[in-house]
């Protein structure tokens, strides 16, 4: 079994030319399946059937493997069996039609509107770093950009006169987004300082040396701003989540929020309706005179 696995990995490396990172992922996942198969006394990939594989996956799930990790493992297993079938080394694919167990979907973390304003309304010093960081924070929250979209943003895609920005999102799809007044003002204050840094290319957000900021650098600046202004760790995607949640709460227009976020499937956007309900329930609990009543005083059953 190990020889077949090694042959498949070599096929991925030499013929499919997958990256070293992807190859390592395949190796780790398939070694897990191999270890479980050998522990069960199996000596051939043909001996692994769907029922056994389902049992293996369930065992890994019980050990704490996430649904995403298990889905990746099953994908790797399907790839192995497709290769073995083409090579005439096995007669079936036990992973065909098998899905990873679903875990409860975690709701995205957001800032409430007051906390978002607290983050953005602090005093800003008139220097290179402060103006740049304020501009990128404002743009994250104003337009709901992904981290990769902000990193890749070039000047030619920014139209401050019209208050618009174009970004290239997932699947290489381009979308046009509005830029709010506060974000426009922050960008207008930043761009003259950017020009003085001899930028190497058209990147909107650069370091002092003129190079485009990396994702890691932006994550660090956002986190530092969160600690400084809010006393909490903050991630760029939390600003995107806050943008979506606050917009949906104000407008109720799920389809518009989907378009602005660049979601291909509206089901992805619907997660924010759960956040909106959480907020409404919280307001109800705080404000409604009957919200925290434990039961009727007289124990009656009147409707």
Curated annotation (Swiss-Prot):
CDD domains reported for this sequence: INT_XerDC_C
Gene3D superfamilies found in the cross-reference section: 1.10.150.130, Intergrase catalytic core
Stretch forming the signal peptide: none
Keywords recorded for this protein, A-Z: Cell cycle, Cell division, Chromosome partition, Cytoplasm, DNA integration, DNA recombination, DNA-binding
Keyword DNA-binding among record annotations: yes
Domain of life: Bacteria
Gene Ontology terms for molecular function: DNA binding; tyrosine-based site-specific recombinase activity
GO cellular component term of the entry, any: cytoplasm
Assembly and oligomerization: Forms a cyclic heterotetrameric complex composed of two molecules of XerC and two molecules of XerD.
Protein name according to UniProt: Tyrosine recombinase XerC
Organism: Pseudomonas aeruginosa (strain LESB58)
Gene that this polypeptide is encoded by: xerC
